[in-house]
From Swiss-Prot:
Substrate binds at residues 124, 149, 275, 297, 299. Monomer. GO terms for biological process: amino acid catabolic process; cell wall organization; peptide metabolic process; peptidoglycan turnover. SUPFAM superfamilies: Enolase C-terminal domain-like, Enolase N-terminal domain-like. Catalyzes the epimerization of L-Ala-D-Glu to L-Ala-L-Glu and has a role in the recycling of the murein peptide, of which L-Ala-D-Glu is a component. Is also able to catalyze the reverse reaction and the epimerization of all the L-Ala-X dipeptides, except L-Ala-L-Arg, L-Ala-L-Lys and L-Ala-L-Pro. Is also active with L-Gly-L-Glu, L-Phe-L-Glu, and L-Ser-L-Glu, but not with L-Glu-L-Glu, L-Lys-L-Glu, L-Pro-L-Glu, L-Lys-L-Ala, or D-Ala-D-Ala. Binds 1 Mg(2+) ion per subunit. It is an enzyme of class 5 (isomerase). The active site is at residues 151, 247. It catalyses: L-alanyl-L-glutamate = L-alanyl-D-glutamate. This is L-Ala-D/L-Glu epimerase.
């Protein structure tokens, strides 16, 4: 018999996380613990209001399948009974973790993947004044970060970006607008970013406005985040985006994430691996995707005042495995 525990946790941040759609001071996560024959498997998710999720709705979704879980629900069956999203993610990752622990293997070994000893991860520069953002970028660079992800909204774009690039002339920069821009003026903004040597622009437009990217000539790659959840989205992204950001909370777990990675690459997309504000538990579950991606943005746990134990080993801009 398999037992199931489901609970919420709130992890305070050491610094407010400010993006185009608001500011957060804590990471709220939902955790699933499965136990079978004395072995425990754990999965974590971060409910996201942008996708119509709350802690309560995700908990309810998880509780709705507890009877099946107790009877031995498999990962394959899970994909059919819950939609992609945070709830399925926590369950899917708990099932993967349980399987790995039962085999006394790491998750990567179970899947047959070799992980690097060190992963270069983006460090996030959150929204602030141009000077604040430049200072943040400079501090991160001096501490060892080589890849910086700059959060922008619809204001002071050139001022912020010029200040940042002046502060860190040699850093690799990617920019995330979190759907805050509009099609009007996008070409000029893309050119500005390209002129500043920005490596990639993530989700400039609201997902429902993606048609504006059709036949849009742009001088740097554009990555789909809010527009890409599962393999079912890929057809609509073709010709509009060059890259997709895979997050387990969007795919509904590692099972669909691995399938999405394979299919996206087969269709010519580059990959980014992202995360929500989360603990090391959530990052550990996503690690098997690392060898396939061009950019890893896994700094969620580094925003926490205290991480879960045992925590992954982060230094500024790097994750050590």
């Amino acid at each position: 018999m398999r037992t199931v525990k489901v609970f919420e946790e709130a992890w305070p941040l050491h610094t407010p996380f400010v993006i185009a759609r608001g500011s957060r001071s804590e990471a709220r996560v939902v955790v699933v613990e499965l136990e079978e024959e004395g072995i425990k498997g754990t999965g974590e998710c971060t409910p996201y209001p942008r996708y119509g999720e709350s802690d309560a709705s995700v908990m309810a979704q998880i509780m709705s399948v507890v009877p099946q879980l107790e009877k031995g629900l498999t990962r394959e069956e899970l994909q059919k009974i819950l939609p992609a999203g945070a709830a399925r993610n926590a369950l899917d990752c708990a099932l993967w973790d349980l399987a790995a622990r039962r085999q006394q293997q790491s998750l990567a070994d179970l899947i047959g993947i070799t992980l690097p000893e060190t992963v270069i991860t983006a460090q996030t520069v959150v929204i602030g004044t141009p000077d604040q953002m430049a200072n943040s970028a400079s501090t991160l660079w001096q501490a060892g970060a080589k890849l910086l992800k700059v959060k922008l909204d619809n204001h002071l774009i050139s001022e912020r970006m010029v200040a940042i690039r002046t502060a860190v002339p040699d850093a690799t920069l990617i920019v995330d607008a979190n759907e805050s821009w509009r099609a009007e003026g996008l070409a000029a903004r893309c050119q500005l970013l390209a002129d500043l040597g920005v490596a990639m622009l993530e989700q400039p437009l609201p997902a429902q406005d993606d048609a504006a990217l059709e036949n849009f000539i742009h001088p740097l790659p554009i990555c789909a985040d809010e527009s890409c959840h599962t393999r079912s989205n890929l057809k609509a992204l073709k010709g509009r985006y060059e890259m997709v950001n895979i997050k387990l909370d969007k795919t509904g777990g590692l099972t669909e994430a691995l399938a999405l990675a394979t299919e996206a690459r087969a269709q010519g997309f580059s990959l980014m691996l992202g995360c929500m504000l989360c603990t090391s538990r959530a990052i550990s579950a996503a690690l098997p995707l690392v060898p396939q991606v061009s950019f890893a943005d896994l700094d969620g746990p580094t925003w926490l005042a205290v991480d879960v134990e045992p925590a992954l080993q982060f230094t500024t801009g790097e994750l050590h495995l």
